[in-house]
Curated annotation (Swiss-Prot):
It comes from the Bacteria. CDD domains: DEDDh, polC_OBF. It comes from Mycoplasmopsis pulmonis (strain UAB CTIP) (Mycoplasma pulmonis). It is found in: Cytoplasm. GO terms for cellular component: cytoplasm. SMART domains: EXOIII, POLIIIAc. Its EC number is 2.7.7.7. It catalyses: DNA(n) + a 2'-deoxyribonucleoside 5'-triphosphate = DNA(n+1) + diphosphate. SUPFAM superfamilies: PHP domain-like, PsbU/PolX domain-like, Ribonuclease H-like. This is DNA polymerase III PolC-type. PANTHER family: DNA POLYMERASE III POLC-TYPE, DNA POLYMERASE III SUBUNIT ALPHA.
């Protein structure tokens, strides 16, 4: 059957090796009916792995196309076991069949021992490795036997010596980590067993593919982590990189000395790690089990600038250049100082957002100066339909009366100064008809390259038959004479011919050129592309790409296009050249490509002018992108204008236009920037050679010197180190907002791309870049002397002001004090209690002295407006710690100690030793003077937490207005101060980790680069923080005093470049100018909206809600006050579902464990739940394990100051400690010593040291006050509560389930709850996750005896739920239906109000509802009350 094997191999295209030609196929069987095939393959000799694999895969692929089922039986007559071949077979089985771990990188070939009888031993060097291999060995044995290795037996053995040597460690740790820790050493230092191992030194790239098990690697630490297990064993993890690759290393240990070693290793330290390569159990990712680790010196030599006279970089980009620069201001300044450079110029792209950080880093540094500038995008105001400015004498030329030469040229390249003309084609048009055609080739001086031939189809033979250049130009000149030139992208053709005419002494005067490309942009601004073929397609002109790029063909196509364009102009009433010349629109400008110039501020006045230019280009001149008109840039003695870098108009003209254009362009600038030749490397494979670039740069320097311009060499750096180039390339290849592309991005992926290395260069490195000039004196001049000359003209500039500038408004300093005392007298009596008088004066004095009164006064006016319109206002932040804020009506939180006050006779009683720090927890009590019930108030909050210990901190007054009222308040602020002085607080959106990861993965795939996950993690970490776009604070409004312009502080822009926005935002992130200008935080919140609805539905004013109520406090720990048990609501232990700030799973769990009993306890819960490391592993442990209560633990930042003062700690130290702890800075040893002296317990001190962030008590109190009120309505007005909840607090419903019985609803909840934690295809969708809380609330409502009806076509509202008291149920609105939306819901209600719906047909006609929603309405039974059609009404 050898012949059948040969035939079969031909069929499957398998080349049979000589030694396998005796192979036979036996017992073939084919069952066509069952689509089954089987056979036996008998190998005489043992097949080599690669041959077997190829045969096996090709056989399988072939049979898969013929039958559904197949069975192959392999036999090998002469079996020979060779270790290297067996290793390959095992690797393949693991990768292709077992698919559970990377076997080939898991063990070394030395771990295999092969016996001739087929027994093969695999040695595992740890219990961990043994467990990993076990399942695979069993699988591999069966697979190898099926391949014909009949007696194959792979046996696993364990290196017992290693296990014995490590046994002491194994017995000392918790059982759950025994497996991993069994092979660990006693410390990071060498153990006895370690000394017996030979660790192979590898690079991190080699590590990825090595077959070695014990390795030694070197890298820089970029991530470290310590995990403490339940058994107190610690897992030390580090990630290291050598900038080519990365890996992770870890160690299990319980030893203190290991902790010390690990603590000594910091991020950016270089280390040498020795250990064993292992795989993670779940992910099977490689890591090194650390046996030894030690810090070493960095093997990478620091670059130094050793020149005596040093250069200055005048064109640096930072992270604030959108999707371009990758360095922070700190990175840039540190490197500049390392080089001992005296200054750098920061020129971000249409942005000055990095200025504040540069200012803060360097303003007080006398030896270093930042030059503040900007790379500005510019375009011409001219529409450039006429390539050169149209002279007045041609203005009245009639379009249809002229003769036109519609032409195209082909060239050897893109540069009129460097390349040659090889073909000309033209059609002459008169009165809309072609009267002449011309076509000829021109002989070039150099041989035609293959690229040009491939693009155009023109060969060297074509050109040999052409005209000499001089003759050709004279012929072209005669064709153009007294006619108008027309070309597509005419600037290229026009300038190319113009340069050739001038070079050959042929007159080129008053040649008028029309560009059909720009004409198309004006006439058809909606086209996505304006290439000749695209425009032809849009105008239905025939265009064949296979013939295109020939002058004769392209000119004939363009002729037909231009005839149609003239017709369109006539239809639009455009008849004269001057009318054509003046055509423009914002859409047209949005299609224009901008070029970049440099602008530098020379002094403080120049900074403001720069800010104004920045504002203008981001607002007034924003045409799809920032593009300022060249013509509108005013020259100033306070600014320097540079020619720009790689993407500048000057470089564009140098490479793609005429010498005359270049000379005219040079005249526009104060100094000429010459980019480093290496920055043009991306041109080398597509447009220009390195030599051509250098020739042109030499010309530019020569011409600029002839015009006595200051010439400076620039590097345009984006990064400091060579390895960072890959990060810049990632951004070059990533799309920004609205799919914007980087200027260096090359669309043609079939070309090799050599992106420039835009590293920050030393003086010597830059001199080397310009060595092609062969003139040391000239090189010194442009690299060192002239940049320093520019720097010497620049003053040290202050970017951020050093004090607060508040608006003068409404005599606020007088009116605020008056209002505060009037309200104090009204509440506490004319003779104010001493404690209140002192507190008012303590606050008012600094508020008035520092000019903070206007902030209070404006806030008070806005709150009163909201209240007068029926909307409550909640306070945020620490404003509630100010009694002045309370008395001016800004906040409801009273910061005084717990006290009683009589609203009738002003009896005042400060409670001694109150049960809690909240006055709301005081028992009800009658006035001893007039027998009226006393009001109770006071939350014990020190004023220092708001304005600082010296009361000089700029106040943040954050207010929660109703979400539906927020816009009106914003407009009110604008009305009060004017649109030129009110701006939304700007933010900067940068690339987050998840987005950076996506960029990197896409780039690596595109570039066919393969890096480990660890190196991707490293790149991700280093790629974050780059600017993507701008944004705005959700409620922050900046107010600029009338006597200033906004540019005295910051430029402005539209948020996220939305030119339709009614507000502009500060260009600087608002934090940068926080201490300079007034910021109001006017936020939108659900609570005021919900409470207004509850007041309306119940008639109960929130002011009348009791401050102490047993039922209300009880629902935070039990549902009993709601009339239900926990069992009735799926085991929920509290009644807090749906209560703002307390209804989340996390907080409800806190409630069930901490069991709050008072209002003060609720404030503590609010503080704990909003802090970081305040509850988890901190207060939670203290309450559960140490038996402390909520009032004893630290929950809010203010607690620390209050508690410490009570213990006798000095007030200033108490304040300092509070500030440190709330910011996560812990305590100093001296502070701990003093606290112990004052009797502060250890658990309290340890608790403070764990805290990373703390919530202000005033904010927590304001939240709890709102929650308390909502809880009141939930307890006493259930239907009103649920109607409000569904109307205001959720947008996600499953109304079909919600309107069914409780059993069905509970079943759905259980299903979703089960799937909530799944991580497979059955996990919850985003909508289901968001709907689940709504279903829990609906279930609770049903448990209380209430129901939800179906949507009622005659009654339901658009958005609000209706209460049906008679049936104890709610009627849902239309907007709960998926896909319907508020607009359509309102349209249904409006149509119904006009006239009752007669039928489904009538409903559809009047609402415009789509068929999908109609079917949804029908399936839900909403149309049951009306007939299908109108016919019944016509009878």
């Amino acid at each position: 059957m050898q012949e059948s094997f040969l035939n079969f191999c031909q069929e499957i295209n398998f080349d049979i090796p000589e030694y396998l030609k005796n192979t036979k196929i036996a017992n073939p069987y084919h069952d066509e009916e069952k689509s089954f095939f089987s056979c036996e393959i008998d190998f005489l000799e043992t097949p080599k792995f690669e041959d077997f694999k190829s045969f096996y895969l090709k056989t399988k692929n072939f049979l898969n196309q013929l039958v559904k089922e197949q069975k192959l039986l392999f036999k090998i007559e002469n079996i020979f076991y060779e270790k290297s071949e067996i290793k390959k077979y095992l690797d393949w089985i693991a990768e292709h069949f077992f698919k559970n771990f990377d076997f080939k990188n898991t063990f070394r070939i030395d771990d295999l021992k092969v016996n001739l009888d087929g027994k093969i031993f695999l040695t595992a060097h740890s219990k961990h490795s043994f467990d990993l291999y076990k399942d695979f060995v069993e699988f591999a044995n069966k697979k190898m036997q099926s391949f014909g290795f009949e007696n194959f037996l792979l046996k696993l053995e364990l290196n017992q010596i290693e296990i014995t040597n490590n046994q002491p460690l194994v017995s000392s740790i918790n059982s759950q980590v025994k497996t991993q820790a069994s092979s660990e050493n006693q410390s990071f230092k060498k153990s006895n067993f370690y000394n017996k191992k030979r660790h192979i030194q590898l690079s991190l790239k080699e590590l990825i593919k090595t077959q070695e098990m014990f390795v030694s690697v070197v890298g820089m630490v970029f991530k470290k982590e310590i995990i403490t297990t339940n058994s107190k064993t610690k897992i030390f993890k580090i990630s290291i990189t050598d900038f080519q690759e990365a890996t992770r290393a870890q160690k299990f240990s319980y030893l203190e000395k290991d902790q010390e070693i690990f603590d000594s290793i910091q991020i950016n330290d270089w280390v040498n790690v020795c250990g064993e390569i292992q795989l993670e159990k779940m992910s099977l990712k490689q890591f090194i089990k650390i046996e030894k680790i030690e810090k070493i010196r960095s093997p990478i030599k620091d670059r130094q600038d050793n020149e005596k006279e040093k250069r200055i970089e005048l064109s640096f980009r930072s992270k604030m250049s959108t999707m371009d620069g990758i360095l922070s201001p700190l990175d840039i300044v540190k490197q500049a100082k390392k080089f001992n450079h005296s200054s750098i110029a920061i020129l971000d792209h249409n942005s000055v957002q990095a200025f504040p950080d540069f200012h803060n880093l360097t303003y007080k540094d006398k030896d270093f100066k930042v030059i503040y500038g900007m790379t500005l995008s510019v375009i011409s105001k001219r529409n450039k339909i006429f390539v050169e400015p149209l002279k007045d004498k041609f203005f009245d030329y009639k379009i249809l009366d002229q003769e036109y030469v519609v032409y195209d040229i082909e060239t050897t390249g893109l540069s009129p100064m460097l390349n040659e003309l090889i073909q000309f084609g033209a059609s002459v048009i008169k009165n809309g008809r072609i009267i002449e055609t011309h076509h000829f080739f021109i002989k070039p001086k150099s041989k035609l390259d293959s690229f040009t031939t491939k693009l155009t189809g023109i060969t060297q033979e074509h050109l040999e038959k052409g005209y000499e250049l001089q003759e050709a130009l004279e012929k072209i000149s005669s064709i153009f004479k007294a006619r108008i030139m027309v070309a597509h992208n005419a600037a290229f053709d026009h300038n190319f011919l113009k340069q050739k005419f001038i070079d050959n002494n042929i007159e080129f005067e008053e040649m008028i050129s029309i560009d059909t490309l720009n004409l198309a942009k004006v006439l058809n601004p909606i086209y996505r592309s304006y290439r000749l073929g695209e425009v032809a397609s849009k105008l239905s002109v025939v265009y064949d790409p296979s013939i295109a790029h020939r002058a004769d063909y392209d000119s004939s196509v363009l002729t037909n296009i231009f005839i149609l364009q003239m017709s369109h102009l006539k239809e639009k009433g455009i008849n004269l050249f001057k009318e054509l010349n003046s055509l423009s629109s914002e859409k047209f400008y949005s299609k224009m490509f901008a070029k970049d110039i440099s602008i530098i501020a020379k002094n403080q006045a120049g900074l403001k002018e720069l800010f104004k230019i920045n504002s203008d280009v981001l607002t007034k001149y924003y045409f799809a992108n920032p593009k300022m008109f060249w013509e509108d840039i005013k020259r100033s003695k306070n600014l320097l204008i540079g020619s720009g870098g790689l993407n500048s108009p000057l470089i564009d003209k140098l490479l793609f236009s005429t010498q005359e254009d270049v000379l005219n362009e040079i005249d526009k600038y104060d100094y000429i920037e010459i980019p480093s030749p290496n920055n043009f490397s991306h041109f080398w494979t597509t447009k220009f050679s390195d030599q051509q670039i250098k020739i042109q740069l030499q010309k530019l320097i020569k011409w600029a010197k002839e015009k006595n311009k200051i010439i400076v060499a620039i590097g345009e750096p984006r990064y400091n180190e060579k390895w960072q180039k890959i990060i810049h390339e990632i951004y070059i290849n990533s799309t920004g907002i609205e799919n914007s592309l980087h200027p260096l991005f090359i669309i043609k992926k079939d070309m090799d791309t050599f992106y420039p290395e835009q590293i920050y260069k030393t003086t010597n490195e830059m001199k080397q870049e310009f060595s092609f000039l062969y003139d040391p004196e000239l090189i010194e001049e442009i690299v060192v002397k002239n940049p320093n000359l520019i720097s010497s003209q620049i003053e040290k500039i202050q970017v951020i002001k050093d004090k607060l500038y508040t608006p003068k408004f409404d005599d606020s300093h007088i009116k605020l004090k008056k209002l505060v005392y009037e309200n104090a007298w009204k509440k506490y009596g004319k003779n104010l209690p001493e404690i209140i008088e002192q507190r008012i004066e303590k606050e008012l004095t600094p508020i008035l002295n520092y000019g903070f009164d206007v902030i209070y006064w404006i806030s008070s006016i806005l709150v009163q407006k909201s209240l007068s319109d029926g909307y409550l206002v909640g306070s945020r932040g620490s404003i509630g710690s100010s009694l002045v804020a309370t008395l001016s009506g800004i906040t409801e939180v009273n910061p005084l100690a717990p006290h009683y006050i009589c609203s009738k006779c002003q009896y005042f009683e400060l409670v001694k030793d109150p049960m809690t720090n909240s006055g709301f927890d005081l028992d009800d009590k009658k006035c001893p003077k007039c027998n009226s019930f006393l009001d109770k108030d006071g939350q014990t909050i020190p004023f220092e937490t708001f304005l600082g210990f010296k009361a000089d901190k700029v106040p943040d007054i954050d207010l929660n207005f109703s979400g539906e009222y927020q816009g009106k308040i914003h407009d009110e602020v604008k009305r009060l101060f004017g649109s030129k002085h009110t701006f939304r607080a700007g933010t900067i959106s940068t690339v987050a980790e998840k987005t950076a990861y996506g960029y990197i993965k896409k780039y690596l795939e595109t570039a066919s680069l393969d890096y480990s996950d660890n190196f991707v993690d490293f790149l991700t970490e280093k790629s974050t923080g780059v600017k993507r776009t701008t944004g705005q604070h959700p409620g922050g409004i900046i107010i600029i005093p009338k006597e200033f312009d906004v540019e005295d502080f910051t430029p402005v822009n539209f948020p996220a470049n939305d030119t339709e926005s009614s507000w502009k935002t500060t260009h600087f992130d608002f934090h940068a100018i926080h201490d300079n200008v007034l910021k109001l935080d006017i936020l939108g919140h659900d609570d005021p909206t919900a409470l207004k609805m509850l007041e309306k539905l119940t008639g109960v004013n929130v002011k009348d809600i009791p401050k102490k109520d047993e039922k209300i406090i009880s629902i935070f720990t039990s549902p009993k006050a709601l009339g239900i048990s926990s069992e009735e609501i799926l085991g929920e232990k509290t009644g807090a579902l749906g209560i703002p700030e307390f209804g989340t799973n996390f907080v409800r769990q806190m409630l069930s464990e901490a069991k709050p009993k008072t209002f003060a306890d609720l404030v503590s819960i609010s503080g704990l739940s909003h802090g970081t490391d305040v509850w988890i592993n901190n207060a939670h442990y203290i309450i559960q394990s140490l038996g402390k209560t909520l009032d004893q633990v630290i929950s809010c930042r203010d607690d620390i100051m209050v508690d410490l003062i009570k213990k006798g700690v000095p007030i200033d130290l108490s304040f300092t400690i509070m500030e440190q702890v709330r910011k996560g800075k812990g305590l100093s040893l001296e502070q701990k010593r003093k606290l112990i002296e004052h009797g502060i317990e250890n658990w309290y001190i340890e608790s403070m040291e764990k805290i990373k962030y703390m919530f202000p008590k005033a904010h927590a109190t304001a939240y709890v006050l709102m929650a308390w009120r909502v809880a009141f309505y939930k307890v006493y007005y259930p239907l009103e509560y649920y109607a409000t909840y569904f109307s205001t607090r959720t947008e996600f419903f499953d109304i079909e389930i919600m309107s069914k019985d409780k059993l069905t609803l509970e079943s759905k909840i259980k299903e979703l709850a089960y799937r909530e934690n799944l991580r497979n295809d059955n996990q919850l969708t985003t909508k289901e996750k968001n709907t689940l809380p709504t279903l829990y609330i609906a279930n609770e409502m049903k448990a209380r005896g209430f129901n939800i009806q179906n949507i009622n076509l005659k009654i339901s509202l658009a958005n609000d739920w209706i209460i049906d008291k008679n049936s104890k149920s709610l009627i849902p609105p239309f907007n709960v239906i998926d896909g319907l939306g508020e607009t359509l819901a309102q349209k249904i209600v409006d149509s119904r109000n006009e006239k009752e719906f007669l039928s489904v047909e009538d409903f559809i006609n009047r609402t415009g509802i789509n068929s999908t929603l109609v079917e949804k309405f029908k399936s839900m039974g909403i149309f049951e009350q009306i007939p299908e059609t109108n016919q019944i009404f016509l009878i």
